[in-house]
Amino acid sequence: MIAALDERLILACRRHPLAAEVARGLTRSGVPDGARVMVAASGGADSTALMALCAGLAAHGRIELVVGTVDHGIRSESALDCHCVAMVGARLGVPVLTRRLDLSSGSGLADRARTARYEALASMALECGATSILAAHHADDQLETMLIALARGAGLGGMGGMPGRRPIPCETPGSQHLLLVRPCLRMSRESLRGACVDLGVQWREDPTNDRRDTPRGIVRHVVIPALESVATGATRRAARTGELARLGNVLLESHVSAMRGPDGSIARSAFQNAPEALAATAVWMLAEDRMDDATRWSAAEAIVDGSTEPRRFPMSGGSELSVCAHSVRVRPATV
């Protein structure tokens, strides 16, 4: 049985304090007034809160709202998750689109499911005319991402965490015009769950979120609580720090991009008297994710050390970063 439209709930969503926070998040991400957006809802507390708060914004014309949910079929409860989304959507008077995935078991299931979910969401967004897909990633998710990136030596860009907006990561035809927008990055997990309680909307619990045998699970349940015990509010402050890191990385990358020649190489003279951070950024941009952390830093040091001796630094796939007397360039793998 589908729930009836609940006008009192919609009014409560309009008046909830976090609705204004979501609106500011949309504005920061460049979502214009009246834009049609689709919330990616899983049935969990985070996306249910975003769905409800966006319904409040839609009620006074800030956005046009559609909800998309994907039954990935990996857990037996996933169909119930989608049903929960549909029930909440009916109470809010919001159209809910659903897709079911048919994934074979085997290696790489999590990655394949993530890719297929984005493809399904993109397909639904294109179907309903949405220009953005809204994800409910919040400040806690952001800090988890930043800490894992820091531990892996991901560079300034990685330490900045998730951007507020980016192209949707899939290859669905037409999806190149879709944006993935994260309006909740300055909000905590606790505040979004609290909004669900305040509004009286039902959500589903995903037991995999309680796992402590994965890198993200360890960071979520062990590392972040320890950080909060040392410095209360660390999660919220880290989200702002991530924004600063991303802005700093944009400045560095724009500088390096301006230094590159038509063939993609960079003159070493451009690094004369420049901080090593600029050389490190150049290595990150040239090598992308094809070089380990220690080699990246060795290459960055070689760029600025003044030596004219040619040196080569290996990259995955057989390519290499070449630091010669006068230039820095990537040499492709030889057959």
Residue spans of the language-model regions?
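AMP-forming adenylation/ATP pyrophosphatase catalytic core
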Residues: I2-D46, A58, V66, H72, ...
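Core alpha/beta nucleotide-donor-binding catalytic domains of modification enzymes
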Residues: I2-H221
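Hydrophobic/aromatic-lined pockets within catalytic cores
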Residues: A151, E228, A287, M291
